[in-house]
Structure formats: C-alpha cells, structure tokens
Amino acid sequence: MLGSLIVNFKLFSAGGAIMEVFSRSFKNGEEIPKVYTCDGKDISPHIGWEDVPEGTKSFVLIMDDPDAPIGTFTHWVVYDIPSQTRELLEDFPKVPEVSGIKQGINDFGRVGYGGPCPPRGHGYHRYFFKVFALSVESLGLPPGASRKDVELKMNGKILAQAHIIGLYKRD
C-alpha cells in the first residue's frame, strides 16, 4: 500500500534543529478525512510546525498533489506567515489576506485552500503539505500571487523545510 512507502520528511537546519510538520486533522501517511475534500465541506485541515531554525522570519506553506494526471496540482499557497506563528487552524478563511498572512491562487483558479478532489477511480493521490522556514519577513508579493512567483521569491531564503503527506481517493 502507498501509505507504507511514506515517511515524515524532516530537514536539518544549519543549527541542528529538525523542523517538523504535523496535523491534528489527519496522521502523516494516512487518509485525509472527507470534510477536508471536495466530497465534504472543502475546509482546510489544521497544519502545524515546530522546531524551527534560529533566524526564521516567516513561513510559506504549499499543498500539492504530484499524482494528478495533468502533473503536479497546487491546492494551497500561503505566504508571509509571521515567524511567531506555529499553526494554521482548521477552516482557514479563503480570502486573500488574514492578519498579514497572504494566500495565493491555487490551480482551481481561486484564492486559498482547495481540497483533494482526484478523478474518480484514479486510486490514492498523495497530498504534500510543505512548510518552508524563511530568512525574510516578507516575500514582497501582493495577496493572490501564483505559486511560481512565491517559489521564485523564496529562492535563496529557505532555512529549513518539512512536510507531511495525506492520502485521498474517490471511487
């Protein structure tokens, strides 16, 4: 089974700390509950992170599905998350900006979270929730930026990254 191949990815920072991503909504390598998908309420799950490296000034979160038939599909882009923030709560608002935290456009063409919605009968897809610790307070992008623009601005500023993986399929 796909779940047995999945490990929690951690990256050592220069200071030796291990940044870790977790969720109270699902366990790493296990199925994402229906409420967080297009078959449910399509609300975002809780995502948290800990053991961030010294010097972290902001975070970026990117959720994607590398198993989509059209290539990697971006479900969520969140950036300029303040350094003191250690989680995004369940049902994070689908608006361009919340208390300085900005959200980009997903591949559904909308701002904010777009839950798992793989083609029926396509089997399990893996959904990566990636958190990046950055050395800058802001990427200098307006709300509604593309993933590509966010990744270009992150280049050379990543102190650490980690992710968890959730699974989902539609029969």
Swiss-Prot record:
Signal peptide location: none
Matches recorded under CDD domains: PEBP_bact_arch
InterPro entries: PEBP, PEBP-like_sf, YbhB_YbcL/LppC-like
Family named by the database record: Belongs to the UPF0098 family.
Record protein name field: UPF0098 protein aq_1250
Organism (species): Aquifex aeolicus (strain VF5)
Record lineage: Bacteria, Pseudomonadati, Aquificota, Aquificia, Aquificales
